[in-house]
């Protein structure tokens, strides 16, 4: 059971695939509330990440958790080469759009892919912000309207369509430990 697994985790550990329905759902879908053991884990310092992959993002779970005051700490993808030719699309921009469609405020979506991951990795002095002296991968995006977004169960929602218009990758060699 997930409750037993959560008890083994320490503050700062990250639970990924937090918005999936099976095998471990973080919400009671009948009451649309976050399970007590999940909330207790967050109170102990356990972090929760989206990790959208082939079977790990469900709009109903995400909407219920976010509405119950339980947004993800970080947003990531579980994107692998074998996912390129599949029906489930989950680029980081699409995953960000799905979280916004599920009720997460846009600024919180952006923080969950920038400064929060940097802080979790204890690199907040080097990453996660646009400040002189910091490393940054920069992406200029343009919102071009809305689009249809699909979760792994086939449920659809309307959400923002963001297109990358320009990108620049930093040289991270100065961060080597």
Predicted regions mapped to residue ranges:
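Active-site core of metal-dependent hydrolases
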Residues: 1-64, 68-86
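Short, structured secondary-structure boundary patches
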Residues: 10-17, 70-74, 95-97, 127-132, ...
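Short, surface-exposed, polar/charged, turn-prone segments marking secondary-structure boundaries
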Residues: 20-21, 43-46, 75-79, 101-105, ...
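Detector for methionine-enriched segments
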Residues: 2, 8, 54, 96, ...
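C-terminal cap of metal-dependent C-N hydrolases
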Residues: 135-177
